[in-house]
């Protein structure tokens, strides 16, 4: 299982980003809470459709779930099309991934 978390910084000790589509970074973890990938979001400055573009990018990376403080309606629609679960949750990235995997 791959879980992507929208992050304010490129660091697992960062805060979860309040916005999914325009989050500055994404960190991807495996089912053991291990960070397996991190990257800058190339769609933060896109005029429109950032959330849809992020959903497609995460699908291409094989992500099963994405976590952010909030999601726009177009992004949630795109995630549902890609069959990616989504969860609105805040806090520190490192704590959030552990909490989600415990549930």
Language model regions located:
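Extreme N-terminal starter segment of soluble prokaryotic enzymes
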Residues: 1-3
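Compact, charge-rich alpha-helical regulatory domains located at protein termini
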Residues: 36-65, 82-87
């Amino acid at each position: 299982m791959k879980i992507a978390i929208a992050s304010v910084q490129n660091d697992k000790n960062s805060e979860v980003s309040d916005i999914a589509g325009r989050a500055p970074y994404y960190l991807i973890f495996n089912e053991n809470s291990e960070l397996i990938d991190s990257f800058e979001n190339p769609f933060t400055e896109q005029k429109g459709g950032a959330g849809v573009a992020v959903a497609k990018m995460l699908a291409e990376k094989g992500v099963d779930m994405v976590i952010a403080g909030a999601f726009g309606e177009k992004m949630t629609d795109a995630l549902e099309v890609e069959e990616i679960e989504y969860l609105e949750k805040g806090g520190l990235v490192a704590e959030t991934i552990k909490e989600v995997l415990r549930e």
